[in-house]
């Protein structure tokens, strides 16, 4: 839970913590952790949701390791998953804090909900079409 807590309140609302715990308890595969010198520095989920589409969820990066290529590494791994499973599209939910990051990888905004996660933390639904690279 430390990685989640380190990302609050900038990237995740503290009220989401129970949802994250429930997700971890229910997810048996598809959630990947990244370690450096035995420190958890990143985590993300990617799951097939249809014959053509996957969903990326709960992407977290340790604040001390942000802007060091971990996000790019995660996206490369996500695209590799899509390619190996012949999936064309990726859906993800994010906030205004990380929207620009996902735009760099071809994501487009498909929905915006002001204060959708919590006060001041807007929910942004995004899609990457033709994600196989």
Locations of the language-model features?
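Conserved GNAT acetyl-CoA-binding A-motif
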Residues: 82-95
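Active-site rim helix/loop that mediates acceptor-substrate recognition in acyltransferases
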Residues: 9-36, 40-45
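Conserved acetyl-CoA-binding loop-helix of GNAT-fold acetyltransferases
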Residues: 61, 67-80
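Conserved catalytic-core motifs of GNAT/GCN5-like acyltransferases
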Residues: 91-93, 108-127
């Amino acid at each position: 839970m430390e990685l989640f807590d380190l990302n609050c309140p900038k990237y995740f609302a503290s009220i989401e913590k129970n949802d994250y715990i429930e997700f971890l308890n229910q997810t048996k595969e598809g959630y990947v952790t990244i370690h450096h010198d035995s420190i958890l520095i990143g985590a993300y989920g990617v799951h097939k949701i249809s014959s053509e589409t996957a969903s990326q969820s709960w992407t977290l990066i340790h604040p001390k390791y942000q802007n060091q290529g971990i996000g790019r590494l995660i996206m490369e791994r996500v695209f590799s998953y899509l390619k190996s499973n012949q999936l064309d599209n990726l859906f993800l939910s994010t906030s205004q804090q990380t929207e620009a990051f996902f735009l760099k990888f071809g994501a487009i905004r498909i929905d915006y909900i002001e204060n959708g996660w919590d006060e001041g933390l807007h929910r942004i639904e995004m899609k990457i079409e033709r994600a196989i690279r």
